[in-house]
């Protein structure tokens, strides 16, 4: 009797058996995509900022080195 009074019967009546698998897979796909997006954005944002900073510092250092070398050797020295 307690089993019949539960809400499982109502949900089954709302969704037919043929449609249940497709709908469930779709919802699962959406959920997984949302989780993936959240995780990826956090990691990529951090990585992108760090890489950009590193690249900028490296380029600045290299330009300083080239400037010093050009001053020492003359305008013919490059990179």
From Swiss-Prot:
Alphabetical keyword list: Nucleus, Repeat
Subcellular localization(s) per the UniProt record: Nucleus
Main location: nucleus
Bias (Basic residues) ranges: 9-60
Gene Ontology CC entries for this record: nucleus
Positions with biased composition (Basic and acidic residues): 61-79
Keyword set includes Kinase: no
Disordered as annotated region, ranges: 1-79
Cysteine pairings via disulfide bonds: none
Sequence repeats: 45-52, 53-60
The UniProt record lists the keyword Nucleus: yes
Protein name per UniProt: Sperm-specific basic nuclear protein SP4
Gene: sp4-a
């Amino acid at each position: 009797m307690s089993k019949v009074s539960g809400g499982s019967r109502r949900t089954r009546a709302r969704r037919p058996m043929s449609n249940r698998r497709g709908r469930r897979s779709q919802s699962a796909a959406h959920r997984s995509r949302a989780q993936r997006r959240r995780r990826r954005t956090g990691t990529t944002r951090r990585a992108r900022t760090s890489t950009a900073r590193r690249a900028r510092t490296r380029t600045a250092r290299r330009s300083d080195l080239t400037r010093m070398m050009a001053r020492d050797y003359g305008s013919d020295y490059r990179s």
